[in-house]
Amino acid sequence: MEIGVDIVDLDRIEKAYNRYGVKFLQRFLSEEEITLCLQKPQVIASIAGRFAAKEAVVKALGTGFSSGVHWKSFAILNDKQGRPFVQPADAGCFPACGAIKISIAHDRHAAIATALIEWV
């Protein structure tokens, strides 16, 4: 079992989004993630939360964004109850992983995410 944590300053995300718009989001989010974020009442917090969650997942993997894992190798989506989950882009993305659990929280200044990976 491994854990990863990341925290993101909302101001940093807001400045980049205001400067580059959707092009900024397309660098690290899938189209489905972008649509979800833009529908949320707190757009910047939603973007920052997904950014932090992706960072937390690769930290838990122990690889960072390398070894074939890229920003768009997986998406951070929400189930019907609103809980975030990891959706791999393809079945081979996390071959040795059992369950990947994530939690995302944010306040006025930052978003934080935790990822827990259970290995097979």
Swiss-Prot record:
Catalytic activity entry: apo-[ACP] + CoA = holo-[ACP] + adenosine 3',5'-bisphosphate + H(+)
GO cellular component: cytoplasm
Sample GO molecular function, one term: holo-[acyl-carrier-protein] synthase activity
GO biological process: fatty acid biosynthetic process
Keyword Transit peptide tagged: no
Keyword annotations of the record: Cytoplasm, Fatty acid biosynthesis, Fatty acid metabolism, Lipid biosynthesis, Lipid metabolism, Magnesium, Metal-binding, Transferase
Source domain of life: Bacteria
InterPro entries linked to this entry: 4-PPantetheinyl_Trfase_dom, 4-PPantetheinyl_Trfase_dom_sf, ACPS, Ppantetheine-prot_Trfase_dom
Biological function: Transfers the 4'-phosphopantetheine moiety from coenzyme A to a Ser of acyl-carrier-protein.
The family this protein is said to belong to: Belongs to the P-Pant transferase superfamily. AcpS family.
Protein name, UniProt field: Holo-[acyl-carrier-protein] synthase
